[in-house]
């Protein structure tokens, strides 16, 4: 996958936006447990009162609190409260830091006031110890005591407070503030409801932001992944179009189709999910860990155990399943190959009654793929139940440990709830990565297969400084001591072939099956590079010309007629779209194609199906010839292109073609002697060697191989 990352450069801006949205989504996701905790701790348990800093309190209460404050604390309180009648109001513009200081000042003082009130056991004990008359407030007595005595009492209390959980101190301060509000006539229930309502509204706002961020990330991810798929398909197409025949043989057609469709689709799907899940999971997981550490670090060991178990499960499963992921795409290739062979060979299969054999071949390929898929899926089915077991076990363990912490006063119920939610978010982040890990290995294999195509070195490339043929020389072909062997083949297919064809000449190539006829003419358009010697067109070595300039000079008709989906007109115009309708008709007339075109209702606009399956072999061949004629090239190459024609059509076509191509060079590969009798030069190939060259008459006189071919096809009267 990493090798294909360069194709994401165009979408760098979108990727940055996705990451920003994911951080926003994670922030909101991680904020929700905190709000839940606050609703339970503050909204329910503390009646909506957040801390020990009262917004309003009576003068008498403040005086009692100041008994247990030092001079600095008293000064800070007086600076942040304003006197109004017999009450004190908290200033509106205090900072967060100041409020925290006031909370610390008030919490301890409120505990002391509550402890020494005349209703408390400690207050009654102190009154008895000091011999105070019944009904005397101990706080009044404390106010009259020397400051040293009060500070001594405070020191003793501080020692006790050190061992007391912070939550108990907070609860005591909040209870004091609630009592003070009730004494002032404030509606504490309204305060509680307002806090819960506002917290709920904030949570709804967070949920809305999460939804919008998730939708935006999904939309942008799909766009980026779609562009990646588009660019990969384009790159594969351009690369494949630059392949020589050598590279085509390296990859089968079925494999190239799979790589440019199925493999690209795999990468595209995983990339879309990767932005939404793989990037989001670590953001959420790390954020959850940080939140957990802030909530209560005493239970983080539970998360450590959970994460360790998850990693062990993933490691074991992937050690078992990973080898199968690697061969999965190869098996898909195999199934595509078998399917393609069967579908294209149905007539032959039926003719030889081999349906059962082909059914067995398909069944084997299908069964191999099915077994591998089942094995992988069975491995992965264990993953989710095990993960859910770990998740539920962690929840139970957190509740058990949290209950003890709540009972000991070291943790609040809301914090336990928040811890559970954070733990679930951390585990869910691992679950998301685990879910992706099912697709990632397969997508990685697909990416490697795509990269294999894109990284393939093309054996036939344009020269850095191309040579342009002279305008004075056109249509000239020269083979200069050419030898050729297929890549990785031990023997030459062609050996020491030399001949020269000039403008206006017709060169024929004949020989037995496998003698190298098609290979010879495939060297002219440079489908292969020669092993030795050189092939020249218009006096320039084809290796020194650009492939486009070379092939623009050629009109090539392959041995097997190839048509493209469209119309008859579009197929004839294929090599030169700008030609006129009259030129299209002329090309069809020369190719003897008007005979069947004119019988069709739509004539030249008649549809041609993919591969030309709705026309006969002879019609397909004639349209292929018309396509080459319409291009009006300098050189015509016919690779046994008349074999599908009847003798009458063959004769008429050759007669019309001779007149039309009189100013062009024509190279014909033929099996029938009658097709090439009038050629200016006939090259006779025998097992890759040139057995003879000359006219029909000359070869009949001095070439034994040609004589054998001629006598096997024609009678002595026809040869005379």
What do these predicted ranges mean?
Residues 1-32, 36-203, 209, 213, ...:
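Membrane-integrated ABC transporters
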Residues 15, 51, 66, 71-72, ...:
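ABC-type nucleotide-binding domain
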Residues 22, 207, 277, 281, ...:
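Residue-level recognition of pore/gate-forming positions within transmembrane alpha-helices
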Residues 25, 29-33, 205, 210-225, ...:
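Alpha-helical transmembrane segments
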Residues 44-51, 58-65, 70, 138-146, ...:
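Short intracellular "coupling" helices and adjacent cytoplasmic loop segments at the cytosolic face
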Residues 146, 153, 245-246, 262-271, ...:
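An intracellular "coupling" helix at the cytosolic face of ABC transporter transmembrane type-1 domains
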Residues 217, 242, 249-278, 300, ...:
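Extended hydrophobic secondary-structure segments
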Residues 287, 291-308, 312-314, 318-319, ...:
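Helix-loop-helix
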């Amino acid at each position: 996958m990493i090798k294909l990352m360069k194709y994401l450069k165009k979408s760098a801006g979108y990727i940055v936006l996705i990451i920003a949205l994911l951080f926003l989504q994670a922030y909101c996701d991680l904020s929700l447990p905190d709000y839940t905790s606050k609703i339970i701790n503050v909204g329910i348990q503390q009646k909506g009162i957040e801390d020990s800093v009262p917004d309003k309190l009576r003068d008498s209460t403040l005086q009692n609190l100041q008994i247990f404050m030092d001079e600095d604390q008293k000064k800070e309180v007086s600076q942040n409260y304003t006197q109004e009648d017999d009450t004190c109001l908290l200033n509106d513009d205090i900072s967060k830091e100041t409020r925290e200081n006031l909370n610390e000042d008030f919490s301890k003082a409120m505990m002391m006031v509550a402890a020494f009130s005349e209703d408390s056991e400690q207050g009654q004990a102190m009154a008895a110890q000091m011999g105070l008359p019944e009904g005397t407030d101990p706080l009044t007595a404390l106010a009259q005591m020397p400051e040293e005595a009060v500070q001594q009492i405070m020191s003793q209390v501080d020692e006790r407070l050190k061992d007391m959980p912070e939550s108990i101190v907070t609860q005591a301060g909040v209870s004091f503030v609630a009592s003070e509000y009730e004494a002032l006539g404030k509606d504490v229930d309204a305060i509680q409801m307002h806090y819960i309502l506002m917290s709920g509204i904030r949570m709804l706002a967070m949920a809305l932001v999460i939804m919008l961020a998730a939708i935006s990330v999904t939309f942008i991810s799909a766009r980026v992944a779609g562009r990646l798929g588009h660019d990969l398909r384009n790159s594969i197409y351009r690369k494949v179009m630059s392949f020589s025949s050598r590279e085509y043989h390296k990859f089968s057609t079925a494999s190239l189709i799979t790589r440019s469709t199925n493999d690209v689709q795999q990468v595209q799907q995983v990339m879309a999910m990767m932005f939404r899940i793989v990037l989001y999971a670590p953001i959420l997981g790390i954020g959850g860990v940080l939140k957990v550490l802030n909530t209560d670090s005493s239970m983080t060991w539970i998360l450590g155990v959970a994460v360790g178990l998850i990693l062990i499960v993933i490691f074991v499963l992937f050690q078992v399943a990973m080898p199968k992921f690697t061969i999965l795409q190869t098996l898909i290739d195999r199934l595509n190959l078998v399917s393609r062979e069967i579908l294209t060979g149905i007539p032959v299969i039926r003719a030889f009654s081999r349906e059962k054999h082909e059914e067995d071949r398909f069944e084997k390929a299908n069964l191999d793929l099915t077994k591998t898929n089942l094995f992988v899926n069975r491995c992965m089915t264990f993953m989710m139940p095990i993960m859910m077991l770990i998740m539920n076990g962690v929840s139970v363990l957190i509740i058990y440990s949290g209950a003890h912490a709540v009972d000991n006063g070291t943790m609040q119920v809301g914090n336990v709830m928040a811890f559970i939610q954070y733990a679930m978010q951390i585990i869910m982040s691992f679950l998301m990565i685990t879910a992706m890990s099912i697709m990632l290995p397969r997508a990685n294999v697909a990416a490697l297969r795509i990269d294999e195509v894109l990284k393939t070195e093309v054996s036939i490339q344009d020269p850095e400084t191309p040579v342009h043929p002279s305008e004075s020389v056109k249509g000239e072909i020269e083979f200069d001591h050419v030898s050729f062997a297929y890549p990785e083949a031990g023997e030459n297919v062609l050996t020491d072939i030399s001949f020269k064809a000039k403008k206006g000449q017709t060169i024929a190539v004949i020989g037995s099956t496998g003698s190298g006829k098609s290979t010879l003419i495939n060297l002219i358009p440079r489908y292969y590079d020669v092993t030795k010697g050189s092939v020249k067109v218009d006096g320039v070595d084809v290796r020194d010309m650009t492939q486009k300039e070379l092939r623009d000079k050629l009109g090539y008709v392959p041995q097997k007629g190839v048509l493209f989906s469209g119309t008859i007109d579009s197929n004839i115009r294929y090599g030169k779209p700008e030609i006129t309708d009259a030129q299209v008709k002329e090309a069809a007339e020369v190719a003897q194609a008007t005979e069947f075109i004119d019988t069709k209702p739509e004539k030249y606009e008649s549809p041609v199906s993919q591969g030309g399956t709705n026309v006969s072999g002879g019609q397909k061949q004639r349209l292929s010839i018309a396509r080459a004629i319409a291009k009006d090239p300098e050189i015509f190459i016919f690779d046994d292109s008349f074999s599908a024609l009847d003798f009458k059509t063959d004769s008429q076509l050759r007669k019309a073609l001779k007149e039309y191509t009189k100013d062009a060079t024509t190279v014909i590969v033929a099996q029938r002697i009658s097709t090439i009798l009038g050629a200016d030069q006939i090259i006779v190939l025998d097992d890759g060697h040139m057995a003879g060259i000359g006219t029909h008459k000359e070869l009949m006189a001095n070439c034994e191989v040609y004589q054998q071919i001629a006598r096997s096809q024609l009678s002595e009267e026809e040869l005379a």
